[in-house]
A protein has these predicted regions:
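Class I Rossmann-like S-adenosyl-L-methionine
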Residues: 1-225
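Conserved SAM-binding loop and adjacent beta-strand
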Residues: 227-240
Length: 240
């Protein structure tokens, strides 16, 4: 098994647990990252990004796949639709990953999961997506805003279309993690130096002095300040 195939298979298993079995994404992803913490940072980052991205963009990904497949996503075998979703995400949103590599690894995954007969189908759909991705457009609100239609309809009835769309758009904004400094264990300076040394992005220009906003970390338990109890996860609103 190649290194790339390995990490993609990990993503496949995570997504099957979440999308097909209904398990909580943050728990399954966290368990996987802990299990495979021996992998290099960039591999764990890949696992995290493809998992979270596929889940976040599922509505749009399904719409794209349906455009290029005679078999609708809902009628596909769970393994096949999951391989297509995670691969379509890479093709559409990860420019540094060659489309040819995505297609080849998807075919390998299909064959490894004993779907040799559908490997050609997987390859065909993905190569069509790759070829036509520059001309794709999304006009349906649920595809554009990545929100189920019934939720948008409910918000529109309550607040009007413009406000409903603004609410949906707010969910597309990447949110850093808010943490509270345990001042009895470490000073603000110590925490900032520790986070900076590990390459995390830190925002400290808002909120109480003991609350920070962090991002660009791979695995929270490997953040020194967190593992030592210097910081704990806390919503900004609860610290006011």
């Amino acid at each position: 098994m190649t290194k790339e195939t390995n990490i993609r298979e990990i993503v496949l298993d995570i997504l099957l647990e979440v999308m097909e079995k209904g398990n909580y994404s943050h728990l399954i992803l966290s368990q996987a990252l802990e299990k495979y913490q021996y992998l290099e940072k960039q591999d764990r980052a890949f696992i995290t990004r493809v998992t979270e991205g596929t889940l976040e963009y599922q509505l749009r990904l399904d719409a794209v796949i349906d455009r290029f497949s005679k078999v609708k996503v809902k009628k596909m075998k769970p393994v096949i639709r999951t391989i297509l979703r995670m691969s379509a995400y890479q093709i559409l949103f990860m420019e540094r990953v060659p489309d040819s590599a995505v297609c080849n690894e998807a075919v390998k995954l299909a064959k490894k999961r004993r779907f040799d007969g559908l490997s050609g189908f997987v390859n065909g759909v993905l190569r069509n997506i790759s070829r036509e991705k520059g001309s794709l457009s999304f006009t349906a609100p649920e595809e554009r805003l990545l929100m189920p239609g019934w939720i948008l309809s409910m918000w529109e009835k309550e607040y009007g279309r413009e406000t409903a769309e603004k609410i949906a758009e707010s969910f597309l904004t990447e949110r850093p993690l808010s943490v509270r400094i345990n001042q009895s264990l470490a000073s603000r300076k110590t925490v900032l130096e520790s986070l900076g040394a590990q390459g995390l992005s830190v925002s400290e220009d808002w909120g109480p002095g003991f609350v920070l906003s962090i991002k660009d970390y791979d695995y929270l338990d490997q953040v020194e300040a967190f593992s030592k109890g210097w910081i704990t996860v806390q919503d900004f609103s609860s610290s006011l």
